[in-house]
């Protein structure tokens, strides 16, 4: 049986596009998202087992929420 997720993948994709558009370097923002996801995965090992959002998606959501802070995506 497939688990039902409480998040909208279209919204996560839109947020990812916003992050990429706001950044001057696409590679750098991708690496930042990956590093944050890796850090989150280490902290929350059983996150997926509880039906939560994947670490990469959670990192995208967090970073898009922080767009107002230029040090997150700044050069």
From Swiss-Prot:
Pfam families: RNA_pol_Rpb6
Any Gene Ontology CC annotation: DNA-directed RNA polymerase complex
InterPro entries membership: DNA-dir_RNA_pol_omega (IPR003716), Pol_omega/Rpo6/RPB6 (IPR006110), RPB6/omega-like_sf (IPR036161)
Domain of life: Bacteria
Cysteine pairings via disulfide bonds: none
Alphabetical GO biological process terms: DNA-templated transcription
UniProt keyword annotations, A-Z: DNA-directed RNA polymerase, Nucleotidyltransferase, Transcription, Transferase
EC number(s) recorded for this UniProt protein: 2.7.7.6
UniProt-recorded Gene Ontology molecular function terms: DNA binding; DNA-directed RNA polymerase activity
SUPFAM superfamilies registered for this protein in UniProt: RPB6/omega subunit-like
Keyword Transferase in record: yes
Keyword Plastid belongs to the record: no
Catalytic activity annotation: RNA(n) + a ribonucleoside 5'-triphosphate = RNA(n+1) + diphosphate
Family (UniProt): Belongs to the RNA polymerase subunit omega family.
Subunit (UniProt): In cyanobacteria the RNAP catalytic core is composed of 2 alpha, 1 beta, 1 beta', 1 gamma and 1 omega subunit. When a sigma factor is associated with the core the holoenzyme is formed, which can initiate transcription.
NCBIfam families: PRK00392.2-5
Reported function: Promotes RNA polymerase assembly. Latches the N- and C-terminal regions of the beta' subunit thereby facilitating its interaction with the beta and alpha subunits.
Protein's name in the database: DNA-directed RNA polymerase subunit omega
Name of the gene: rpoZ
